[in-house]
Amino acid sequence: MKNIRNFSIIAHIDHGKSTLSDRIIQICGGLSDREMEAQVLDSMDLERERGITIKAQSVTLDFKASDGETYQLNFIDTPGHVDFSYEVSRSLAACEGALLVVDAGQGVEAQTLANCYTAMEMDLEVVPVLNKIDLPAADPERVAEEIEDIVGIDATDAVRCSAKTGVGVTDVLERLVRDIPPPQGDPDGPLQALIIDSWFDNYLGVVSLVRIKNGTMRKGDKIKVMSTGQTYNADRLGIFTPKQVDRSELKCGEVGWLVCAIKDILGAPVGDTLTSARNPAEKALPGFKKVKPQVYAGLFPVSSDDYESFRDALGKLSLNDASLFYEPESSSALGFGFRCGFLGLLHMEIIQERLEREYDLDLITTAPTVVYEVETTAKETIYVDSPSKLPPLNNIYELREPIAECHMLLPQAYLGNVITLCIEKRGVQTNMVYHGNQVALTYEIPMAEVVLDFFDRLKSTSRGYASLDYNFKRFQASDMVRVDVLINNERVDALALITHRDNSQSRGRELVEKMKDLIPRQQFDIAIQAAIGTHIIARSTVKQLRKNVLAKCYGGDISRKKKLLQKQKEGKKRMKQIGNVELPQEAFLAILHVGKDNK
């Protein structure tokens, strides 16, 4: 056991985590040169296309250190994006140490800080690594000072390396073996294994990634899931070298995969403890904090025949992604679907893309909303995650919206732009600290504004230099109203949005104008209105298409023409009473972009 090292790699987006993982795998000979490819751990197509890591991946490698010993390294490559920070905290729970990778050109950014604090809270040994020293813009001395100033860990002898060229990566491994402590645990005690991650394999059922804390797990053992009390047979187990390799046992301190032929998706939830049925452990390991979704949206299959397969797909995906929340929902405009909760807009996009690609579904998404706390006049408190669930205005005593605490790190030059943006988003400044050339800003901004497009706007006003980390702070009373969209005097529930009263006029008008461009012209006039309660705040009309009924009259009597026009008018009127308006998918997506184009 003393030769096992478990560690994660944490860093801000694009500071080179996945490239460093590639080099480590190459140096330790996990894959032959022929099998090696860039970002070998980002196995999902989506990850490669976007160049981001979404799922944490684990690898077991052997490393022969300069002291002659061979060490077993279990390492987990983690995502850097703020929407996936729960993946990071789960990975860290399985480790004793973490490599904090910082780009020697960019310096410390908000996510570096957030992930590092998560690691420190879990009492992990943090080893700073300065990456990308081959870049002409690299300034390792300045960045080492920044790490000490902002993060507060000693970085005077931080390892310097370039993951791209491979310089200094061996030093990283040597430092790692020296500084990160071996796992603690009792190899002879009762088995306790923590499930770090699971995914669904069509042939094997549920595959779980586990970290053995105490005891040993052998092939063929009877395994008991502590939260459900179910017992299963350990059919196959092994490690990733990134390839799946079978082993006969997993020892104390190791990280590996396990297949128990669990067919039920909820059979082995992430964060649960596995123990042996013969000699069970007395208590479960502390699991993970449940993450609360911040953004909710309705997902509906385009054809209602897909509902069953959509439900199965969501089940399989939620096994792999513990933070996805979903419940059935029906809408008069869109039929049956699910109300899903996500950690942020990127998370929502990724989930939708994964459902469409991996499970071959066609989906319609409604506008994302956050959770509001509503106190009714009957003094009840309810939580509303969709505009259609909001009680009527005269039943609401107080409506409170969620406030997010946003920590931003940015160069001084962009301070003015960013402050202007925060004020526009109804933000309140709570703190501002200068660290050399960097400024750390803390703002309290309504969550609805943060999840909409704050991140994109922050990046564009600061030319990509500002970085953001946010978390939910509290609910605060606010003057929010629901803007309904009426098409030919019928409310379309899927198009409603909740917004602040100050912005409601402009949002309503903008939405109506957008809808006017997107709804195709029909044989009759379509009135599109935005309303707060019964008060109409904006209207526009999609003009009807009409046939020229006078084409066949050459000159002739005016009363003949009047008769024809009158007849057409009556026909249109009758059509309007019974006609339905087909809304294209773009119309539902229009709400997503309200408030973006005019800035």
UniProtKB/Swiss-Prot annotation:
GO MF annotation terms: GTP binding; GTPase activity; guanosine tetraphosphate binding; ribosome binding; translation elongation factor activity
Swiss-Prot/TrEMBL catalytic activity: GTP + H2O = GDP + phosphate + H(+)
Pfam family, one: LepA_C
Record GO biological process: positive regulation of translation
Function, in words: Required for accurate and efficient protein synthesis under certain stress conditions. May act as a fidelity factor of the translation reaction, by catalyzing a one-codon backward translocation of tRNAs on improperly translocated ribosomes. Back-translocation proceeds from a post-translocation (POST) complex to a pre-translocation (PRE) complex, thus giving elongation factor G a second chance to translocate the tRNAs correctly. Binds to ribosomes in a GTP-dependent manner.
Sequence similarity: Belongs to the TRAFAC class translation factor GTPase superfamily. Classic translation factor GTPase family. LepA subfamily.
Record protein name field: Elongation factor 4
Species in which this protein is naturally found: Salmonella paratyphi C (strain RKS4594)
